[in-house]
Swiss-Prot record:
Keyword Aminoacyl-tRNA synthetase: no
Taxonomic lineage of the native organism: Eukaryota, Metazoa, Ecdysozoa, Arthropoda, Hexapoda
Cross-referenced HAMAP family: eIF3k (MF_03010)
Organism: Drosophila virilis
Stated name of the protein: Eukaryotic translation initiation factor 3 subunit K
Family per similarity comment: Belongs to the eIF-3 subunit K family.
Length: 222
């Protein structure tokens, strides 16, 4: 569903158009933006710029602060790891948001993901599962991030460990993630994540440095 914002002149703009002008800081549009955040959670879509605009409006209008929307924005940021969206959102939080117990729980979950302690993350996620059950695709988004880390860390990995890192998934679900990432089986208990050909190859980089760039420095050394 398209979200339209009504301007003072009676005309309507899309959210993207509104975010490109000074109207993004108009508190009259906050309810529309909050509804847009809820739609992102429901429909498994994501709009970082709009979500950050909501947090910025909370900064300007603390009396309009909505904690449930804050939780949803932070959790949606987690679904876009390894990008730094969560850090940007966290920097916009008000002191009263930072002191909130649920916000602290989400920050803890983010820290756990950042240090790649995925087993602990899934344990904590199970304890706090009601917090993000309204966010469609949350678990698979985290598994996508886990797959990214596994792909940059391992050449081969045991199936049981991979299942654990992906949240204790069933064999059939594991097969889907193996195919999705282009991984291959090796024997009965190993998964090949990267072959020898997949390794990063060294590359010679030549940079042209003009004399004018170092002339002043050389003169100081004489």
């Amino acid at each position: 569903m398209a979200h339209l914002v009504k301007m003072e002149n009676g005309q309507s703009q899309t959210i993207q158009e509104m975010l490109g002008c000074i109207e993004r800081y108009n508190p009259d549009h906050l309810k529309i933006l909050e509804s847009y955040v809820q739609d992102q959670a429901k429909n498994n879509t994501y709009d970082l710029e709009a979500n950050l605009a909501v947090l910025k409006l909370y900064q300007f209008n603390p009396h309009m602060l909505n904690f449930d929307i804050t939780y949803t924005i932070l959790l949606k940021c987690l679904t876009n790891l390894p990008h730094t969206d969560f850090v940007m959102a966290k920097c916009l939080l008000l002191p009263q948001q930072m002191k909130d117990e649920n916000v602290q729980t989400i920050i803890d979950l983010a820290d756990i993901l950042e240090r790649a302690d995925f087993t602990l993350f899934w344990q904590r996620a199970e304890v706090n599962r009601t917090m993000f059950r309204h966010i469609t695709g949350f678990h698979d988004s985290i598994r996508k991030f886990v797959s990214h880390v596994v792909g940059t860390t391992f050449q081969t990995i045991k199936k049981d460990l991979l299942k654990e890192l992906l949240g204790g998934i069933e064999d059939s679900t594991l097969e889907n993630w193996i195919k999705r990432n282009g991984w291959k089986h090796q024997g009965h208990d190993l998964v090949v994540v990267a072959t020898q050909d997949d390794k990063i190859k060294t590359k010679n980089i030549t940079e042209k440095i003009e004399f004018e760039n170092v002339g002043a420095l050389m003169a100081q050394c004489i």
